[in-house]
Curated annotation (Swiss-Prot):
<keyword id="KW-0830">Ubiquinone</keyword>
<dbReference type="InterPro" id="IPR017900">
    <property type="entry name" value="4Fe4S_Fe_S_CS"/>
</dbReference>
<feature type="binding site">
    <location>
        <position position="125"/>
    </location>
    <ligand>
        <name>[4Fe-4S] cluster 2</name>
    </ligand>
</feature>
<feature type="binding site">
    <location>
        <position position="122"/>
    </location>
    <ligand>
        <name>[4Fe-4S] cluster 2</name>
    </ligand>
</feature>
<feature type="binding site">
    <location>
        <position position="132"/>
    </location>
    <ligand>
        <name>[4Fe-4S] cluster 1</name>
    </ligand>
</feature>
<keyword id="KW-0472">Membrane</keyword>
<keyword id="KW-0997">Cell inner membrane</keyword>
<keyword id="KW-0479">Metal-binding</keyword>
<dbReference type="GO" id="GO:0005886">
    <property type="term" value="C:plasma membrane"/>
</dbReference>
<dbReference type="GO" id="GO:0005506">
    <property type="term" value="F:iron ion binding"/>
</dbReference>
<dbReference type="InterPro" id="IPR010226">
    <property type="entry name" value="NADH_quinone_OxRdtase_chainI"/>
</dbReference>
<keyword id="KW-0874">Quinone</keyword>
<comment type="similarity">
    <text>Belongs to the complex I 23 kDa subunit family.</text>
</comment>
<keyword id="KW-1278">Translocase</keyword>
<keyword id="KW-0520">NAD</keyword>
<dbReference type="GO" id="GO:0009060">
    <property type="term" value="P:aerobic respiration"/>
</dbReference>
<feature type="binding site">
    <location>
        <position position="86"/>
    </location>
    <ligand>
        <name>[4Fe-4S] cluster 1</name>
    </ligand>
</feature>
């Protein structure tokens, strides 16, 4: 028979019911509990210190790169559609929810006739916007798209920017497009430093030539 040794001989195992209740109270009710209650009551009684908003009367301002319902962009100058019908978004879609039908127009150029996205199946991963070479498809910030049916399709006319609202189209809005401060987040490469060094040398040579004159 094996010999068992108590790790903490000073700790007594409760036997009676009162000893068990007393041990449970000592372990559950401690000073940290009242500290947490004090912090909660302090934040609760503060005015204008709410961490939530009164939705739907108030809405959170989302970042431009938030991935919500898709948008198809136009060129502001010519008002033409940016989509060239390459089909990369349809091929890269991991949810298999994008369908595109293309044809050739009278000039022999590819034209997108039908474009649909199953919004109920889409997981809004953003791959379609990232792979688009023309920045034709981006993600907007319209997130209120609840529907009664699981299969909810959006079509080309639903995503494409109307011509009468083209002036309000923001170039850098939506995931897949470059941010306004994108240059600040680009990691400098050795080639960048070489170019900067060449510019410094050119400026020095220009100054020396000006002084010699």
């Amino acid at each position: 028979m094996k010999n068992y040794y108590l790790v903490d001989e000073k700790r007594k195992t409760p036997v009676s019911t009162w000893e068990k209740i007393s041990q449970a109270l000592r372990r559950s009710v401690k000073l940290e509990l009242f500290v947490g209650l004090f912090v909660m009551m302090r934040e609760l009684l503060k005015r204008n210190n709410s961490a939530t908003i009164k939705y739907p009367f108030e809405k959170v301002k989302l970042d431009n790169r938030y991935r919500a319902v898709h948008r198809l962009m136009r060129f502001i100058e010519s008002e033409n559609e940016r989509c060239i019908g390459c089909g990369l978004c349809e091929k890269i879609c991991i949810s298999n929810c994008i369908r595109m039908e293309t044809s050739l127009d009278e000039n022999g150029r590819k034209k997108v006739g039908n474009y649909s996205i199953n919004l109920g199946r889409c997981i809004y991963c953003g791959f379609c916007a990232e792979v688009c070479p023309e920045l034709a498809i981006v993600h907007g910030i319209e997130y209120e798209n609840a529907a009664e049916q699981r299969s909810y399709f959006g079509y080309k006319q639903d995503f494409l920017t109307p011509i009468d609202k083209l002036k309000n189209q923001v170039e850098f809005e939506g995931a897949g497009s470059l941010r306004k401060d994108a240059n600040l987040w680009v990691k400098k490469t050795p080639n960048y430093y070489d170019v900067m060094q060449e510019r410094v040398l050119e400026n020095q040579n220009t100054k020396e030539q000006g002084e010699n004159k």
